[in-house]
């Protein structure tokens, strides 16, 4: 049920409806893009449509109706307002074609994979050119290793990052992770941060497995986490470097935010107002930030009152774009101190305005809009 008592039905992932909803309900969204046969960027995650076709082998007109072009999303005023005026964030994930599709060089031609990434960058660059979004509000990332080299061969102001470890574009959830396991073991989270920094990537997307659970102890090298000395080690090593973590579940969301990290959530149901930790849930820590007093007030609310309290505070708490300059400076200064951000306050404030936040700001991001809704478990 939502605030009006109506039953909420989650929109299909990566649809315009899901992405607009997610953008309005949290600090931003992540979406997946593929390049159709007629060079249109379309919203779709899986390597095949639900009818078994490779999206890259079909034109936009031939694709199923549920596969929408990115232009349809960018025509939505609510989406654009949140992104360009209210500090919300957009993560564009580029998907590589399945090698058996025959596109992007098939199984062996790495040069063609790079060319495919270049074509996607060029198309997105042209589509986004008329939109006035801040530099720190957008990133393009991909599991395709050639994304970084491709970005250097295209004239663009967009920022790029790699998803690591490399999850292949072929296989099912199990086989993809079996192939990626050696890379996971050989690369601790600090080592991944070093690689991202060397590539001048503005952030690091990573799996929760690096930070929580048995798997977090498997990586060689210095391990980090969300509690105790592991958290202290993470904060000290990170120095504010942005880390975006998926999945951000009910049992980890508050820990991620308290660590100064960004979480990608698959749950934005209106009734999801209580986390497993017992805390009331707040899905706009960046674009509608709580003061210390407001956080104490919300944390002190009995569980049975979470729904009404959260909805009440959504109406009362001042959103980022309506804060005074002094209030924004206070938030940035407080966050810098709390999480040991390395960059000087002047550099942070250059990225800070009514319509933007610095890269370091922790957020809640809607994964594929309102969450994944297909069987394949990859991000």
Question: Which residues make up each language-model segment?
Answer:
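Phosphate-group recognition and catalysis centered on beta-loop-alpha active-site segments
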Residues: 1-379
């Amino acid at each position: 049920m939502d605030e009006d008592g109506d039953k909420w039905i989650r929109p299909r992932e990566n649809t315009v409806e899901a992405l607009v909803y997610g953008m309005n309900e949290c600090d931003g969204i992540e979406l997946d893009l593929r390049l159709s046969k007629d060079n249109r960027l379309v919203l779709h995650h899986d390597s095949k449509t639900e009818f078994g076709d490779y999206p890259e082998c079909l034109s936009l007109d031939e694709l199923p109706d549920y596969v929408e072009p990115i232009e349809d999303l960018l025509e939505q005023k609510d989406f654009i307002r949140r992104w360009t005026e209210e500090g919300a964030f957009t993560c564009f994930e580029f998907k590589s074609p399945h090698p058996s599709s025959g596109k992007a060089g098939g199984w062996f031609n790495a040069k063609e994979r790079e060319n495919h990434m270049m074509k996607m960058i060029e198309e997105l660059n042209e589509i986004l050119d008329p939109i006035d979004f801040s530099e720190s509000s957008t990133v393009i990332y991909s599991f395709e290793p050639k994304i970084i080299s491709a970005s250097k061969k295209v004239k663009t102001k967009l920022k790029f990052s790699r998803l690591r470890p490399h999850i292949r574009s072929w296989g099912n959830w199990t086989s993809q992770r079996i192939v990626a396991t050696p890379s996971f073991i050989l690369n601790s989270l600090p080592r991944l941060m070093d690689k991202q920094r060397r590539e001048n990537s503005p952030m690091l997307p990573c799996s929760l497995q690096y930070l929580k659970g048995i798997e977090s102890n498997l990586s060689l090298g210095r391990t980090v986490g969300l509690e105790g000395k592991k958290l202290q080690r993470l904060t000290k090593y990170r120095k504010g470097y942005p880390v975006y973590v998926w999945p951000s579940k009910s049992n980890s969301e508050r820990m991620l935010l308290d660590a100064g990290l960004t979480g990608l959530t698959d749950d934005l149901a209106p009734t999801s107002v209580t986390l497993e930790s017992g805390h009331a849930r707040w899905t706009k820590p960046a674009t509608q930030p709580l003061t210390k007093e407001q956080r104490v007030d919300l944390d002190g609310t009995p569980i049975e009152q979470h729904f009404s309290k959260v909805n009440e505070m959504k109406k009362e708490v001042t959103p980022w774009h309506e804060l005074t300059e002094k209030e924004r400076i206070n938030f940035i200064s407080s966050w810098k101190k709390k999480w040991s951000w390395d960059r000087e306050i002047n550099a942070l404030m250059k990225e800070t305005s009514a319509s933007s936040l610095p890269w370091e700001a922790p957020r809640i991001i809607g994964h594929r809009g309102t969450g994944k809704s297909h069987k394949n478990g990859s991000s």
